[in-house]
Each structure stands twice: as structure tokens, then as C-alpha cells.
């Protein structure tokens, strides 16, 4: 699709300042000493880790995370040395063993259940490697992690020392990188309802180098709601990547009919988003009257926002 190529070009522009190749390798006759280190990924209290007899699983609020990306960086030079993309089918999911060179490392981890996650290089080209295989980096390097649709996502970094007498196991606690947006409809969905269109500025990628969220663009989330016809009090939930400091954006909600006409198009200005918090926009979206409400208040965190419209 054309939008796919436009998004790749957009990401390339976002990543223009990131080098697309690794530092030149130096030839040495010395044999590199290595050690096997077990990495255990867990998360904040809202996230649980289970260990069935078959394999480990990592879940958030009862929903399993599907992909884990582990980046092994040389702490001194910042060079990416190795990468492991684990899918939920891996027998050691969230608990892999890594072969690491002696020395100082920075390990960065992203765990997600976003739809179709993929790595991109600095030009916006998809960067591929074998799933569930620890891959040595050479040539072009991955610069960003993106997805076709953002869902619950976590990340963290940890410095690791590898050598004689150092720990053979490292635990990394992951923190949420997203906010949740809830559209809480207070009216009854009409018989001819078709789609909900949510338009907002959102971040589309995560930088591999420092796990910051990057590439903000205007995006549409289109949800098919025809199955809700005749029902009342139905809410829809979305996830958005959020910078550490949070951000605000206008959110436009458009309700459409099967005839191709609009019931309403409502813009809520300056909607706040913060990591690990839920923003709720509550009101009537088909027979709109005054009294919208926006809020951030959720079991994820003690604080939140609510906006009534």
C-alpha cells in the first residue's frame, strides 16, 4: 500500500541523524573471552510472569506479550554488538541465555504485544534477523522498532559486567512506555453505525539506541463498530507510545454511518497522555450534547485524567 511506503520514508527522515552502519571492526589476534549470562525479564507490579512446565510467559493485565527485543551494546563505545528477537513460541521466552564478551555491556529490552512489530534501519528499510536466534551485528544496524498498530509495550535498560566472578544471571524490570486511551460512549450505537475514526498525533517508533519514543505523526485509528448497533455504554481502548515527560495532542472523534455520512465530528483539544496512565474521553458521540469529559485515572496508576464532553 502507498501508506506503507510513505511511513517508511517518514521514519527515514526521523532517523536521519542515526548512523546506518556499525563502527569499523578492528582485526585482532586475541581470542575474545565470553560467558553465558541468563537474562530474566519481568515488569512492574501490574505485570505478571508465569512459568509453566513448557515455557515462560510474560503477561500484562492478563494479556500475554508476544515479542521481546534484546539489544546488547558495548557500554564504552555505544556500538550494538548483538540482537535477539524472541517470539512467544520460544521455549526460553523472557528468560534467554546470552553469550556475552567479557567487559561492560548495556542491555536494552523492549517487550510488546503490538501488531506486526518490525525493526527499521536509519533509512526506514525493514531490518530482518532470524527469530529466537542471538544475532551478531555487522554492516547495517537496526535503528528503530515500529509496529503497524501500537499496543501494550514495556522497556528498560541495564548495565551488565561480564567477567570472572560476575553474576551469571541478570534481572531487568521493564516499565510501561505507553498510555491507554479509552473512548467511553454514553449513548446507544445506532442501527446504521459503521466506524469510529480517532485522529491524533502519536509516536510510531522506539529508538533502539536509548528506548526514547520517536517519529510523531498525525495518525488515524479506525475501528469497525457495526457489531455494536443497538448497544449502549460500550467503550473502546487504544494504546499510544508516550515520551518520558508525557505529551498533549488534539483528538478528533468522527462517527460514521453505513451510508457514508457522519453522525458527528468532535475535536477535544490538548488531551494529555502520560506513561502508565489512562486517559478517558467520555460523552455522547452520535447525538452529541455539551458535557464531554477527559480523564486520566486508572488501575495502572493512582493518578489519571478524565475529560467529559
Regions found by a protein language model. Name each.
Residues 132-177, 184-186, 266-309:
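Extracellular beta-sheet/turn segments enriched in Thr/Pro/Gly and aliphatic residues
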Residues 34-36, 93-95, 167-169, 180, ...:
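Intrinsic-disorder/low-complexity, polar/charged segments enriched in Ser/Thr/Lys/Arg/Asp/Glu/Gln
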Residues 2-5, 15-47, 183, 276, ...:
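Bacterial Sec-dependent N-terminal signal peptides
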Residues 108-110, 180-184:
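Residues within well-ordered beta-strands of beta-sheet-rich folds
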Residues 57-124, 190-277, 296-298, 302-309:
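Tryptophan-paired
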Residues 32, 63, 102, 174-178:
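Short, surface-exposed loop/turn motifs at beta-strand boundaries within globular domains
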Residues 25, 40-62, 184-192:
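Structural motif
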